[in-house]
């Protein structure tokens, strides 16, 4: 990295920002931007309007690595002063040196993920902060990169699992749970700012508190254990006060999840703790799961899914899977297809297995040809979409609560409790006439569902 002298801005220093990767990386970006704003920096929407640029990278799969390297290159070409942070910053090249520094030696500095303090130190070094920070001008909820009516709430960092296809622990470290009081304070500030939906995220939401032995914290004078079940209950109580939603992501299928389902189905938190689980099953055959080092047993998972649906018939389950994992036989793949049909998962994504540099799965025998992996992914998605279409068709004729995300010339676009933003379906709301006068973005409206197609619904207010 070059020893570049500090930039001397002619007015208020401006920082450009590029955020790549998953919602967890987005939260890291929000924290950095919040701190920049608190210290008096302006955020520039263009390269040429910025004194320097921060690029928050992703390094999980090869495509993400290339996208991040390209983004860094673009920022260097367009601006020339670039600080890099994020998962790719922790990735080494084949020679053992930093990958980013090797590909782009002109960057000013590189940090790993979840490195607010380091990033700010580098910003201060290369672009000294203003003398009069305006901390009071920054909202208590912080600066958010999502629309104003929903936000991601990250409850922990890192992961204790060592799945063979994943390199996240090498980049983000072991599980570190946030203090429950900090999580609740952020949630309250977000609700106060007008957020109508909180999306709880982490690498492993079910493991929240394991690292601190579920120690008891306090919020508004009440004891709350650092444990997923207790946190969800507290968030549900808070959401009920603001008429808002709480949605759970990255939930491993541990027995403790059984304690959360009743909150979705009945009691004071029904309608606030959404009947929605994002559960990364990844596969269903025990031998494949063993090679993946996944903390799950397929038979017990099926029993658990059935139990969840018995407790909460409206439950929506989203999951992701990998097809064509090293050593996967056709018989094992058929077991996966059978699981999808029997479990009747509502929302499903699938990746054809792709080697990730640094993953231990690369050392496994039985690597499958690209065409086999892609063919299995296509077959998987065909079955998954059939199941999803049957599930969603059952909603026609029902009246559902919808959170409005957008209003345009054709009417409104929103989501039900079964739809997370950006990854699930939407509801197209008619009529278009006077839509903007009847409701606004962030409102909840009751919609009579009149049609379904693929992952989306159509309806009328």
Swiss-Prot record:
Keyword annotations: 4Fe-4S, Cytoplasm, Iron, Iron-sulfur, Metal-binding, S-adenosyl-L-methionine, Transferase
Cofactors required: [4Fe-4S] cluster
Binding site for [4Fe-4S] cluster 1: 22, 58, 87
Domain MTTase N-terminal: 13-128
Molecular function terms, GO-annotated: 4 iron, 4 sulfur cluster binding; aspartic acid methylthiotransferase activity; metal ion binding; protein methylthiotransferase activity
Biological processes annotated in GO: tRNA modification
Catalytic activity field: L-aspartate(89)-[ribosomal protein uS12]-hydrogen + (sulfur carrier)-SH + AH2 + 2 S-adenosyl-L-methionine = 3-methylsulfanyl-L-aspartate(89)-[ribosomal protein uS12]-hydrogen + (sulfur carrier)-H + 5'-deoxyadenosine + L-methionine + A + S-adenosyl-L-homocysteine + 2 H(+)
Matches recorded under PROSITE patterns: MTTASE_N (PS51449), MTTASE_RADICAL (PS01278), RADICAL_SAM (PS51918), TRAM (PS50926)
Domain TRAM: 393-461
EC number per UniProt: 2.8.4.4
Pfam families found in the cross-reference section: Radical_SAM (PF04055), TRAM_2 (PF18693), UPF0004 (PF00919)
Cofactor remark from the record: Binds 2 [4Fe-4S] clusters. One cluster is coordinated with 3 cysteines and an exchangeable S-adenosyl-L-methionine.
All residue ranges annotated as the Radical SAM core domain in the record: 145-390
Function: Catalyzes the methylthiolation of an aspartic acid residue of ribosomal protein uS12.
UniProt cross-references to HAMAP family, sorted A to Z: MTTase_RimO (MF_01865)
Protein name: Ribosomal protein uS12 methylthiotransferase RimO
Lineage of origin: Bacteria, Pseudomonadati, Pseudomonadota, Betaproteobacteria, Burkholderiales
Gene: rimO
